[in-house]
């Protein structure tokens, strides 16, 4: 990525917006995985009561940041539909190598720790600001190589997107229907910007970059600042038996599928693999429902859009979060001694939901019922309480949709 490049065609701008959607999506999954790995109970060991409070704070911060990454994805979708595109929610499977994006930093699933926090800091690092001496020293204290830091930035990508919205004539660029834009009245994202012209597109970009990297005089209240503070706290708390994260395996998968790239590791524990497969199926359905809500004109079907968005967003904390946390309490299998499983965020093969709202609802209802039936079968097994809660919540949601 280089801000010396001129973006002056719709095609180039749409390509960049698709890249931004992939990045926001992948980074959100990486954050969630780290959050799932943080211990909850003192019985898990490795922390005192005081340290437990710190770990709980870290988990809350990471989940909040991940929710803002989903807001960023929604903003990118609004920018995309504003100029005639459609929401893009696919991405390469994990792990994504450093060379895949110009970030020069891999995007993968690994538990909370110095290595994952270093990656998160580099994802959110302010554009055009070289890692300063204090940050390099912090990386060194955390046991990471402080000198080999070569990376682009998400902010740089949004700089290119900004140039496209600035360079292409406004009257030619914004061809999308205004009633196709999602707003906070339809989906529970309070900071969602309706993109209808150049000014609102720039406002959406500013919202993303300010939340991620912060602004020059206030980095602390940004994703970048939050992750720097976490790494400082972790480095200073090292020793004395402090172990805040569960020993989850890196880049797990319910089943290994190379069709979308990635070199994930298959979970060998059959029950954990089934739970991970259920997680993937719920996650994929959630994305389909959200993408459908953003893709089609809301005129006359506002109630349907609100219902789709409400159910999709409800699946995140009530089903995906407890399943994800619970998987990290289940052994990964004999091939991974001492390691626990985790969700792979695998994208399952499926067709797009149809434009007709009634037919789309029928497909989603049927799929929810299928997944609820699978959850009922899994509930017969010995499972962590959080997994059981996620399965029961899925049944309730399926029966009320």
What are these regions (language model features)?
Residues 2-401:
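Non-heme di-metal
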């Amino acid at each position: 990525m280089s801000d010396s490049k001129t973006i002056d065609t719709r095609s180039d701008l749409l390509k960049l917006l698709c890249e931004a959607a992939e990045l926001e999506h992948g980074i959100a999954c990486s954050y969630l995985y780290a959050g799932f790995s943080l211990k909850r109970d003192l019985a898990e060991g490795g922390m005192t009561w005081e340290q437990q409070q710190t770990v709980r704070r870290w988990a809350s911060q990471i989940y909040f940041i991940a929710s803002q990454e989903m807001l960023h994805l929604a903003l990118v979708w609004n920018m995309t539909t504003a100029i005639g595109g459609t929401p893009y929610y696919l991405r390469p499977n994990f792990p994504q190598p450093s060379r895949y994006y110009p970030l020069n930093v891999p995007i993968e699933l690994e538990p909370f720790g110095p290595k994952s926090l270093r990656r998160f800091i580099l994802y959110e690092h302010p554009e055009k600001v070289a890692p300063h001496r204090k940050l390099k020293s912090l990386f060194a204290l955390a046991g990471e190589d402080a000198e080999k830091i070569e990376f682009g930035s998400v902010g740089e990508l949004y700089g290119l997107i900004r140039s496209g919205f600035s360079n292409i004539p406004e009257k030619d660029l914004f061809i999308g229907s205004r009633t196709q834009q999602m707003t906070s009245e339809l989906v529970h994202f309070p900071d969602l910007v309706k993109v209808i012209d150049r000014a609102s597109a720039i406002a959406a970009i500013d919202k993303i970059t300010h939340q991620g990297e912060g602004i020059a005089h206030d980095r602390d209240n940004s994703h970048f600042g939050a992750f720097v503070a976490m790494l400082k706290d972790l480095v200073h708390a090292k020793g004395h038996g402090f172990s805040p994260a569960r020993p989850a395996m890196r880049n797990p998968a319910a089943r290994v599928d190379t069709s979308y790239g990635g070199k994930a590791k298959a979970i060998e524990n059959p029950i954990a693999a089934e739970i991970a497969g259920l997680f993937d199926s719920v996650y994929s359905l959630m994305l389909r429902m959200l993408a459908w809500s953003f893709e089609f004109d809301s005129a006359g079907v506002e109630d349907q859009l609100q219902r789709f968005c409400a159910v999709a967003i409800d699946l995140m904390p009530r089903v995906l979060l407890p399943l994800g946390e619970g998987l990290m309490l289940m052994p990964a299998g004999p091939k991974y001694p001492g390691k626990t499983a985790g969700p792979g965020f695998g994208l399952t093969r499926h067709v797009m939901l149809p434009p007709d709202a009634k037919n789309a609802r029928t497909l989603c209802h049927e799929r929810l019922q299928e997944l609820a039936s699978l959850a009922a079968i899994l509930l017969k097994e010995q499972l962590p309480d959080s997994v059981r809660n996620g399965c029961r919540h899925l049944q309730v949601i399926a029966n009320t949709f």
